[in-house]
Amino acid sequence: MPTAYLSLGSNLDPVRHLREAIDALRERFGEVEVSAVYRFPAVGYAGADFLNAAAAIRTDLSPEALNAWLHALEDAHGRDRSGPRYSDRTLDIDIVLYDDLVAEGAGNLRIPRDELRHAFVLKPLAEIAPGAMHPLESRSIAELWRAHPEHDVAFEQVELGSAPPGTSPTRAPAR
């Protein structure tokens, strides 16, 4: 099964929405590796800070079907798609990498995501997938993060709260 790497973000009741999104991913896909959660300033507009994380899943879904499933999850969390592109979000989940695929499709599907140039995607992704390769840059996620101008910024780590016994609130159960 392919591995998909996801970027998760929220700045409206973010702890609840991210926790519930991670739970939904685990319910649908089983084991999910999740990065720590970090606080980042909004990009592209003046808004509340976002909480962002990355997740890795093994999926039986095509990129198009996975994108549709993620949109349904966002919608279930009250995602409003009628506003400007850069705006507050209850939940924003994007497929940033899907194995070594390069693709575009309906529903704003772009793999790899252009947002891979931003710290809010690269930092958490480098934590869980340092060796994953950007299919267009021919560099690893770790290399891209080390070269990023915000690499040395100390972004605040945020805990999502209670988790099942034997797990961390923001990490998958031990293997």
Feature map (PLM): residue ranges:
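Short, surface-exposed acidic-centric catalytic microdomains
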Residues: E20-P63
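Hydrophobic pocket-lining residues within nucleotide cofactor-binding pockets
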Residues: L12, Y38, A103
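Short beta-strand-to-loop capping motifs
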Residues: L8-S10, A55-L61, L97-D100
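Extreme N-terminal starter segment of soluble prokaryotic enzymes
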Residues: M1-Y5
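Short, conserved charged micro-motifs
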Residues: V15-H17, L61-N67, E104-G105
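Flexible, gly/pro- and Lys/Arg-enriched active-site loops
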Residues: V43-F50, N67, A72-R175
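N-terminal structural module
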Residues: G9, V15, A24-L25
